[in-house]
Amino acid sequence: MNVSTLLYLDANQRMKDRVATEWGEETARHIHLTHGCSIAVLNGEILVGLISAYGKKLPLLEITDWYIDILEVHKEYRRMGIATQLIEMVSGRARERGIYQLRAWSSEDKAAAIPMWKALGFGLCPASTYPEGKEVKGYFVAKVL
């Protein structure tokens, strides 16, 4: 497959509905259509990837950052630079809007993504979260734009 033929599109409600149908409601609920940026990737008619980031005010400071709420690439399309391209596109849009930094969370089960975050200049902070009282280990990642 030639990655230069992939189509990167701003997500809209129709795309969000499509994600819900094809990838599930849980994935679709992480797509933010306002106060941020959401981009989907198509190979022909096949949805192969998406990213969504939304704005958050930082405490104690009058600056805003974007939190990458979801970054997914279909298993068959991984290791082709799609996630990197999505992050670079969101970074560019964030810079255009004067956003201070990008942040994300990468859980232990997605450890394969850590080298990508590092290669893109993100700092890593090991941490645990406790959704529903159960520990989930991983990393917070952040990059000042």
Feature locations, PLM:
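Conserved GNAT acetyl-CoA-binding A-motif
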Residues: A94-S106
